[in-house]
Regions:
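Short edge beta-strand/strand-turn motifs with a hydrophobic/aromatic core
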Residues: 128-136
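N-terminal onset of structured domains
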Residues: 2-115, 121-125, 137-178
Length: 178
């Protein structure tokens, strides 16, 4: 409860201090994938840019969901507290005409890769090259600090015997004031 109060207070003070732009600096990341969906999935972070390489041996059907969990460290990376988490229907995000934070991130990634804009996704080699999260895409309520973003991609219902995990990514980053 105390950590929730601390996070809420810090977010309030950050908001009260204005909406100055922030820089999102990729530090490191790792991933694990299900060979049922990927022959290969590689994540590399070099010089604050992210590269992804993935090979899908078969069509990835509709129904792929992603849990995006954004966490902040209040003790320099020793432990993390959840700021927010959303479960997204990936097909809805990629094909939506509505703008959202997640849609904006995806559009930015499309500028640096060859991701599909429709579902289902056919077998193939997909990539992302030299991608940065531009300052205008960093939510203004994220205060400076150490962050962990967990991306959990799955089919079925999460945390049940019907869950079929496709991919997990952990990305560590810093948020700095520009």
């Amino acid at each position: 409860m105390l950590s929730l109060f601390t996070i809420t207070t810090l977010l309030f003070l950050h908001q009260w201090g204005g909406t100055q732009a922030s820089t999102f600096v990729f530090q490191t990341g790792n991933c694990s994938f299900n060979e049922k969906y990927f022959d290969n999935f590689t994540l590399a972070i070099v010089n604050n840019t992210m590269d992804l390489d993935m090979v899908t041996p078969r069509t990835i059907p509709r129904g792929l969901k992603a849990l995006i969990d954004v966490q902040i460290s209040l003790d320099k990376g020793k432990s993390y507290q959840r700021l927010f988490a959303h479960v997204l229907d990936t097909c809805s995000i990629v094909s939506s005409v509505r703008t959202s934070m997640f849609k904006s991130w995806f559009e930015s990634m499309r500028d640096h890769g060859n991701f599909m804009t429709n579902c289902p996704v056919p077998p193939g080699h997909y990539f992302l090259r030299n991608w940065r999260l531009d300052s205008q895409l960093v939510p203004h309520y994220l205060m400076p600090g150490d962050y962990r973003v967990l991306a959990h991609f799955f089919f079925g219902k999460q945390k049940t015997k019907h869950e079929d995990v496709a991919l997990d990514m952990d990305i560590y980053a810093l948020v700095r004031k520009s």
